[in-house]
Amino acid sequence: MSARPQNVGIKAIEVYFPSQCVDQAELEKFDGVSEGKYTIGLGQTKMSFCDDREDIYSIALTTCSSLLRKYNIDPKSIGRLEVGTETLLDKSKSVKSVLMQLFAPHGNTNIEGVDTVNACYGGTNAVFNSINWVESSAWDGRDAIVVCGDIALYAKGAARPTGGAGAVAMLIGPDAPIVFEPGLRGSYVTHAYDFFKPDLTSEYPVVDGHFSLKCYTEAVDACYKAYAAREKVLKAKVQNGTNGVENDETKTPLDRFDYVLFHAPTCKLVQKSYGRMLYNDYLANPSHPAFAEVPSELRDLDYEKSFTDKTVEKTFMGLTKKTFAERVRPGLDVATLCGNMYTATVYAGLASLLSNVTFDPSQPKRVALFSYGSGLASSMFSVKIVGDVSGMVEKLDLHKRLNARTVLPPQTYDEMCILREHAHLKKNFKPTGNPDTLFPGTYYLTEIDDMFRRKYEIKA
């Protein structure tokens, strides 16, 4: 039996976002809200959207086909394909089965995996399943692909500017330049009605906004603690009881991560959450020199009150202001310029990070990732960037592609939302959106027949 695969992780990555977006400052004016409510209050600059020509099938096909093409991946070399999404078109048929159109013509139908659904967390579950598959006795030597993506839409009102659209596809296998740290995961899963989609006649969710923010913050706390506990166990095993840890007195546990990526419902929430991680470090060790200026009354603050306490928020956002700019902000380009891609958001954050920072394989960097899906399921895990990622950066061509989009007025965005409302659940339907607006290589819907079967073409 050959040795087990080593350095399992991400070998290739592709991001897709629609060709059209709306400017959040213009949206503020259009919605009649105060200046800065979306751009400063939420930390959002632009928001991606699509008309009735794109759906989850087309977006997944576009992203997966682009990954295969750009990285010259042989479709026969894939043994697992899994999709994470919460944008459902069918209560039975998976998005993964639709993607088999990219593999079956090459004679490859022996591919494991289906769809994983839990709000914005499905992509991470698909990644975990794929990593587990490569590390398992079921692995047949081939690579896995994970596709995660969504169209995030909200009914008119306070939540609408937190929408977005896009997808990420990743090639996962051994000997990767971005390696998942084995065994280092902490999760928090519980029952909560913070954001859910019980009305299948609508694309819009039911949202309890304030409660959802609290759930997200609780999940950050719990996952960070669970990750630290797991790390402690693994370190103890490696050291076999000896104390081989060198402690730098000036550093906090948060400093063990060179970069941190978050699921980003809004970029402002990410900034608060990074500060929240340091608050957890403070509670674990209030006498650490880094916390000399922290008001002592915060040490004994009731946990429930900590979610709404402005002193906690301001203190730890202040203490992390510099490190946030260095370690978190580089991963937020797609989130601030496209909005929330739901399942794809944290992985689009990885694409942003790769595109903004030059990584040297001789100096591996450690990146923490926090993934959250309402309802709720969440995890914190970490990767090490150990290899050459310059080829990924070149193929992503992220900034050039972001700048190539068309910014449309809020009125048009509103009309597109209405267009999608009319298209929802229709059969015998021909979309009316203009395919000429799409980027070349984009799959788009041409018709839905009388049995709800969908047909697509590719923009030349």
From Swiss-Prot:
Pathway info: Metabolic intermediate biosynthesis; (R)-mevalonate biosynthesis; (R)-mevalonate from acetyl-CoA: step 2/3
Class of the enzyme per the UniProt entry, highest EC level: transferase
Q: Which reactions are catalysed by this chain? A: acetoacetyl-CoA + acetyl-CoA + H2O = (3S)-3-hydroxy-3-methylglutaryl-CoA + CoA + H(+)
Q: Which UniProt keywords apply?
A: Acyltransferase, Lipid biosynthesis, Lipid metabolism, Steroid biosynthesis, Steroid metabolism, Sterol biosynthesis, Sterol metabolism, Transferase
Catalytic center residues: 86, 120, 263
Signal peptide coordinates = none
Functional summary from the UniProt entry: Hydroxymethylglutaryl-CoA synthase; part of the first module of ergosterol biosynthesis pathway that includes the early steps of the pathway, conserved across all eukaryotes, and which results in the formation of mevalonate from acetyl-coenzyme A (acetyl-CoA). Erg13A and erg13B condense acetyl-CoA with acetoacetyl-CoA to form hydroxymethylglutaryl-CoA (HMG-CoA). The first module starts with the action of the cytosolic acetyl-CoA acetyltransferase erg10B that catalyzes the formation of acetoacetyl-CoA.
Looking up NCBIfam families in the UniProt record yields: HMG-CoA-S_euk
Protein name per UniProt: Hydroxymethylglutaryl-CoA synthase erg13B
Taxonomic placement:
Eukaryota, Fungi, Dikarya, Ascomycota, Pezizomycotina
Tell me the name of the encoding gene.
Answer: erg13B
